[in-house]
Design a protein with these regions (language model features):
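Well-ordered alpha-helical segments within folded domains of soluble proteins
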Residues: 14-21, 65-72, 118-123, 177-181, ...
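Terminal-appendage/accessory-domain detector
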Residues: 1-9, 106-119, 126-358
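Glycine-rich, mobile lid/loop segments that gate access to catalytic sites or pores
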Residues: 24-117, 130, 137-142
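Short acidic alpha-helix initiation/capping motifs at coil-to-helix transition points
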Residues: 13-15, 63-66, 311-316
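Hydrophobic pocket-lining residues that define ligand/cofactor binding sites across diverse proteins
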Residues: 23, 74, 187, 191
Length: 358
């Protein structure tokens, strides 16, 4: 899935897809129309994201999902200009999501916030289609969004569709840990974890703030916190040599080996690295060994960045690795083969025909 936007703070425009697919299948839209709706949703997400930076005002990126899903769904439903405007207003006015969902010791709601947002975006479009009216000036009106955010202009850049500039994750965790994971995998073959005295991770400010600024990141007790913990993830990969679900089991959260190594991790912002963000996602890991030697690695582009695109082969392997946790290998391969030809499907209702598991 084309997953993440990084400029301005963070977020996942791909969270719009489930809502858009639901609408498309309900009205039996063709796949080409669904793709157009998704591209439009990404463009709106990007424009909001770049123009407003609502994160600084305490508003979660799930808000962008609500608005962009409403726009994509309105396109699918063929709303008139007037109804389209009501759908946007209905997505904005009742749906201010708070960023506290992604701070401190994270809860299960972190995983539900954007799904709820997409659902609300679909609901806004459906209600507008049925004739429900909404405030005419949701942004600039009295007590509108601008009173919370300050005024901003939506700038729609006219180069290529923004879906092509979104980032893909190689690893199923926060995007700002992706570069560090690749470094840690490389370092695993060079160090004996038992000989590590200290691990110093230098990164850009946003990565530090997102995945290493809270004490809970050093003592995660659930998946939600652990997969947004840079010290935990790096410690686990240094021990295991790879990234996987084994890092997020209840047994692992009580493993004294990884807990001890995690306690030896220091994460700090490097202003030089901050200056490279968001065009680069730089990270430097320096390991201090008990024999006084040091080992250091640096990387500034994770696999899946628009300037370092993930290959089809790597993407397929990621899908199969995740899918086979739920279905058999043969079933996963069949599903993958089916989805790889979705652009040839006439009806969006055929999208899941090859995904049925018996």
């Amino acid at each position: 899935m084309v997953r993440t936007r990084t400029q301005g703070g963070g977020g996942h425009p791909s969270d719009c897809w489930a809502g858009l697919i639901a609408v498309a299948q309900d009205i039996d839209a063709d796949m080409n129309t669904l793709f157009k709706a998704a591209s439009l949703a990404y463009d709106v997400y990007h424009a909001l994201f770049k123009s407003s930076n609502l994160r600084d005002k305490g508003i979660d990126n799930a808000f962008y999902v609500t608005v962009s899903t409403a726009v994509g769904a309105s396109f699918l439903l063929g709303l008139s200009r007037e109804s389209f405007a009501h759908a946007v207003s209905l997505s904005v006015v009742p749906n201010i999501s708070l960023g506290v969902a992604r701070t401190g010791r994270l809860s299960m709601w972190k995983a539900g916030a954007s799904a709820n947002a997409a659902r609300n975006g679909v609901f806004a479009a459906i209600m507008a289609k049925e004739g429900l009216t909404a405030p005419e000036l949701p942004f600039s009106g009295e007590r509108g969004l601008f009173q919370l955010s300050s005024m901003f202009d939506l700038n729609f850049e006219k180069d290529q569709p923004k879906i092509f500039q979104a980032h893909m994750k190689s690893y199923l965790c926060d995007y700002h840990s992706q570069t560090a994971i690749s470094i840690a995998i490389k370092l695993h073959s060079k160090v004996d974890p038992a000989q590590i005295e200290k691990i110093c991770i230098s990164t850009y400010w946003f990565a530090w703030n997102e995945v290493a600024s809270d004490p809970s990141k050093w003592q995660p007790s659930n998946r939600e916190t652990a997969d947004h913990s840079l010290p935990w993830i790096v410690s686990g990969v240094l021990l295991d040599g790879d990234f996987g679900e084994a890092l997020f089991t209840s047994e692992r959260f009580n493993d004294p080996l990884i807990k001890d190594l995690c306690s030896r991790v220091e994460v700090k912002e490097d202003t030089e690295l901050t200056s490279l963000f968001p065009n680069r996602m730089p990270c430097r890991i320096k390991i201090f060994l008990k024999n006084k030697q040091t080992i250091e690695e640096y990387l500034d582009l994770p696999n899946g960045h628009p300037d370092f695109p993930i290959s089809d082969g790597d993407l397929n392997q990621k899908f199969l690795k995740l899918a086979t946790q739920t279905v058999s290998s043969s079933q996963a391969i069949n599903i993958l083969n089916h989805l790889q030809h979705m652009d040839l499907m006439q009806s969006s209702r055929k999208l899941f025909d090859g995904c049925l598991v018996t």
